[in-house]
Amino acid sequence: MDIGKKHVIPKSQYRRKRREFFHNEDREENLNQHQDKQNIDNTTSKKADKQIHKDSIDKHERFKNSLSSHLEQRNRDVNENKAEESKSNQDSKSAYNRDHYLTDDVSKKQNSLDSVDQDTEKSKYYEQNSEATLSTKSTDKVESTEMRKLSSDKNKVGHEEQHVLSKPSEHDKETRIDSESSRTDSDSSMQTEKIKKDSSDGNKSSNLKSEVISDKSNTVPKLSESDDEVNNQKPLTLPEEQKLKRQQSQNEQTKTYTYGDSEQNDKSNHENDLSHHIPSISDDKDNVMRENHIVDDNPDNDINTPSLSKTDDDRKLDEKIHVEDKHKQNADSSETVGYQSQSTASHRSTEKRNISINDHDKLNGQKTNTKTSANNNQKKATSKLNKGRATNNNYSDILKKFWMMYWPKLVILMGIIILIVILNAIFNNVNKNDRMNDNNDADAQKYTTTMKNANNTVKSVVTVENETSKDSSLPKDKASQDEVGSGVVYKKSGDTLYIVTNAHVVGDKENQKITFSNNKSVVGKVLGKDKWSDLAVVKATSSDSSVKEIAIGDSNNLVLGEPILVVGNPLGVDFKGTVTEGIISGLNRNVPIDFDKDNKYDMLMKAFQIDASVNPGNSGGAVVNREGKLIGVVAAKISMPNVENMSFAIPVNEVQKIVKDLETKGKIDYPDVGVKMKNIVSLNSFERQAVKLPGKVKNGVVVDQVDNNGLADQSGLKKGDVITELDGKLLEDDLRFRQIIFSHKDDLKSITAKIYRDGKEKEINIKLK
């Protein structure tokens, strides 16, 4: 959006600023209008409103003017900031440069001032030696030209002279020393002529000399200009004595580069010896050379001497020491700066040339050493390989010789080893078979012990037959099953035998035929029976000593999977003394029993399950463990299609409780609460609604009838009550109710029952006596 005065801004920014401007202006107008309304009447207020609300065109013009002025002010601020930043950068750079070169500038200025003060002494000295110096102009001109070429293109000249000067001789060294001496003489003559001309001009020449000296101290590399001035002068010669002294001063000066810390002492000694000659002073370029290299006393030393590089810290330390030395020796060392600069430059160029030659020789030496070391390594590797091959050949030869000499003995030794291995395997197999036989013998011994116990048990198991076959109305096969069973002699007192068997075996007959294992028979009398436990006790008398009393075990210690033996007389006397083997398949089984054969279960019998073969006639037989002790009495078998070896035995501990009462009382007194019950599972929906049974109740019994003045009536039990829990145990049906009640036949204590009456849950105590 172009708003005039060369200001262009985005359209969105223009609109946003315009909205802000109008909003602020309207707010000010409203504020002014509100204040005017408080001070003037309604008519005046309306006129004021018309004056305050200006034309929209005026608003846009005011906005553009305001925005343009704002942008101009912003541009001015930006330009001022940039100018300030550039100025600050320049100030910082100048301050840095000023600080960086402050030390050198101070020393150079001090040298120039000191040189001006001693111009008179210098002029006198140079006048005395001017004639001798002019005679050597031609020689100095040639050598100075050669030095300029070497300094301008030192890399090229250095590479060309490296091959020629790689091994300098003594004659070459002397030649270089003479050239250096002649160059120093030319430098001194050049400076003498210049100072002589300047001294003739008086005060004007002194100012000119100070400027020349300061320029030379600030710009050391300007050797070409001084050479041109020397070329315009006449040649001079110096005595041989002055050449030697100047060479000694030059050597003393080079010592200062090598020994650093002893520089001041060497210079002071040199000045004392040459007090009537020109003292030496190092310029800035000499400082650079001293910072980068360390040289010997002799500048023309052997070119193989390596140059060592200094670190930044060492260079800074040398600079500081050099500046301090210059300040200390300004009064004595500022005479002939031009001469010293030229002589030092020529010395430095020669030294650099020698160093470049030295570096080239070192490089060639390194290459030669590298090739030599590579060849040596290759030779070593080849020699090692040859030695390895020779060693392998020697080993193979040794093995061949050894085999040719001792092969019969080795064959015999291998045969002996193989024979030993075969015999060891045979003996191990024999020992293994012996161990297996021992194990089998041990098993056979155990089996023999078990069978011995079984044979003893057979002497305690008898056949029990009643006499119902003559007058029984049952079918013959059914009658024979009921008439024949087995019994166990659990106690013997003299000739009196006490035999336990099943109640369904003795039936209703009082007298029973008892047949022993030796086929002798006696008549026994039934002392008592209990249909709820399906047990009966028969008493018989026999003087046969072969009949033995069975050992009683403990049924509370039975273990699932424990081996057992079943001894009985299946199918009568013809198969008496049959022994079958099995294990205990289950514990604490509740087996429903139908005693009266009306297809309705009468009682839950507590028993353990066995898988030994049980057949008709085994009822009342003995279940013994491997020790031959009685642990149970065979009571029932499940006879269903596709069901095999599922038989049940009454635990011997329960048997002992029952037979004790049967011996003395002939019966078992069970508590009778005087109720008749129905199972909840057999109720229909109408009967469930009649007793108001909750839907969550699935198992239990419903009281159908309560005897007057019976234990149930006395306990508060009523018809229609639903019993779901008895003595803390869940009640499934009426068989479970009878089993729990009969389990308290010995203590006859009251038990707690949980019932539902009219749909409400409650607890009552049922009396058992």
From Swiss-Prot:
Keyword Glycoprotein appears in the UniProt entry: no
PROSITE patterns: PDZ
Superkingdom field: Bacteria
Region entry Disordered, spans: 1-390
Enzyme Commission (EC) number: 3.4.21.-
Membrane disposition: Single-pass membrane protein
GO biological process entries: proteolysis
GO cellular component: plasma membrane
Basic residues bias: start-end ranges: 1-20
SMART domains: PDZ
Keyword Cell membrane: yes
MF (Gene Ontology): serine-type endopeptidase activity
Biased composition (Polar residues): 126-137, 247-262, 331-347, 365-390
Subcellular locations according to the entry: Cell membrane
Biased amino acid composition, Basic and acidic residues: 21-64, 71-108, 138-186, 264-296, 310-330, 348-364
Active site: H504 (charge relay system), D534 (charge relay system), S619 (charge relay system)
Family: Belongs to the peptidase S1C family.
The name this protein goes by in its record: Serine protease HtrA-like
Taxonomic path: Bacteria, Bacillati, Bacillota, Bacilli, Bacillales
